[in-house]
């Protein structure tokens, strides 16, 4: 396991140097040279890299008290844009319910009787009141219920998320656990804490917390540009949509274990449970009691 601390190789999504179409270099030389034998095939593998990224730790007063490191698996720069784009499209597609439905002319009510005679009226011929040309008639090529979900491999989906997080480290920092500082819900206190940390309440900020304490959640839910996420609700869209990322020491440890180079491959059950939670809207619970074991 080799790591590099060079800052020149760090990913930067917000600088648009990695994901901007202008940064892609096109060469007239072939990317892949096929061997002379027509039976052998050569494929380009997605080489995964790792980089040790330092992040400052701030206390509740906004003072720097230490430093921690984020060590995530990331796609190489020449392939990162495609991997993140594919992960984003998959996330947005799988959120679609696909329940839109319209009635065709064969499904609308009525229309069995000819409205008026074919001839001798001076009007255009009309065969059915359910024609799409008439008000209340059917819809031509309207939407019908369908499944919009598309498949993306687990490893690639996790790589897209870790690459997006690593690309935003230039606008990220770590704060100490601050839930005990909110004895009661108060939005004014949360905004004051954000300003001490150097955050502008007008900018989109994402707080990644291990647990969502009630006082913290109620203090921040009135801030339109603020997003509070937990490991169960962490998703690629909110990471890319945020201008600032704020972590806690617990979430940094979670990310290094979950998306880092030492990630265990036998965590399928836990991964499926958390990824199912990502499809549920943030903060929405169905209230259904869990079945007794």
Swiss-Prot record:
Tissue expression notes: Highly expressed in cotyledon and weakly in roots.
Anything else known: This protein (expressed without the transit peptide) is able to provoke transcription termination from the spinach chloroplast rDNA operon and the E.coli S10 operon in vitro.
Highest taxon, organism lineage: Eukaryota
InterPro entries the record matches: Ribosomal_uL4, Ribosomal_uL4-like, Ribosomal_uL4_dom_sf
Ranges of compositional bias, category Basic residues: 116-126
Subunit composition and interactions: Component of the chloroplast large ribosomal subunit (LSU). Mature 70S chloroplast ribosomes of higher plants consist of a small (30S) and a large (50S) subunit. The 30S small subunit contains 1 molecule of ribosomal RNA (16S rRNA) and 24 different proteins. The 50S large subunit contains 3 rRNA molecules (23S, 5S and 4.5S rRNA) and 33 different proteins.
Alphabetic keyword roster: Chloroplast, Plastid, Ribonucleoprotein, Ribosomal protein, RNA-binding, rRNA-binding, Transcription, Transcription regulation, Transcription termination, Transit peptide
Similarity field: Belongs to the universal ribosomal protein uL4 family.
Species: Spinacia oleracea
Subcellular location field: Plastid, Chloroplast
Pfam family, one: Ribosomal_L4
Function: Component of the chloroplast ribosome (chloro-ribosome), a dedicated translation machinery responsible for the synthesis of chloroplast genome-encoded proteins, including proteins of the transcription and translation machinery and components of the photosynthetic apparatus.
Annotated segments matching region Disordered: 107-138, 259-293
GO molecular function terms listed in the Swiss-Prot or TrEMBL record: rRNA binding; structural constituent of ribosome
GO cellular component terms, A-Z: chloroplast; ribonucleoprotein complex; ribosome
GO biological process, one term: translation
Compositionally biased residues, Acidic residues: 263-293
Span of chain positions assigned to the transit peptide in the UniProt entry: 1-50
Keyword Oxidoreductase: no
Name the UniProt record assigns to this protein: Large ribosomal subunit protein uL4c
């Amino acid at each position: 396991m080799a790591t590099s601390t060079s800052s020149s190789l760090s990913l930067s999504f917000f600088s648009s140097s990695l994901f901007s179409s202008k940064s892609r270099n096109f060469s007239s030389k072939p990317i892949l040279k096929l061997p002379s034998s027509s039976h052998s095939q050569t494929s380009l593998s997605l080489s995964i890299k790792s980089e040790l990224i330092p992040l400052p730790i701030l206390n509740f007063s906004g003072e720097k008290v230490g430093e921690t490191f984020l060590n995530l698996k990331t796609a190489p720069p020449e392939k990162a844009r495609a991997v993140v784009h594919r992960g984003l499209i998959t996330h947005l597609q799988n959120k679609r319910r696909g329940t839109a439905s319209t009635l065709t002319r064969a499904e609308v009510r009525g229309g069995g009787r000819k409205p008026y005679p074919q001839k001798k009226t001076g009007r255009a011929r009309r065969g059915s009141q359910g024609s799409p040309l008439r008000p209340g008639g059917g819809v031509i090529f309207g939407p019908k219920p369908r499944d919009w979900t598309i498949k993306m491999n687990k490893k690639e989906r996790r790589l897209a998320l870790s690459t997006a997080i690593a690309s935003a480290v230039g606008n990220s920092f770590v704060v100490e656990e601050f839930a005990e500082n909110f004895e009661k819900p108060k939005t004014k206190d949360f905004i004051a804490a954000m300003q001490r940390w150097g955050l502008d309440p007008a900018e989109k900020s994402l707080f990644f917390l291990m647990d969502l304490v009630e006082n913290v959640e109620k203090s921040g839910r009135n801030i339109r540009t603020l997003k509070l996420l937990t490991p169960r609700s962490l998703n690629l869209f909110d990471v890319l949509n945020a201008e600032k990322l704020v972590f806690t020491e617990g979430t940094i440890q979670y990310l290094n274990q979950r998306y880092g180079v030492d990630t265990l491959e036998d965590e399928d059950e836990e991964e499926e449970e958390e990824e199912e939670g990502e499809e549920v809207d943030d903060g929405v619970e169905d209230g259904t009691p869990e079945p007794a074991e």
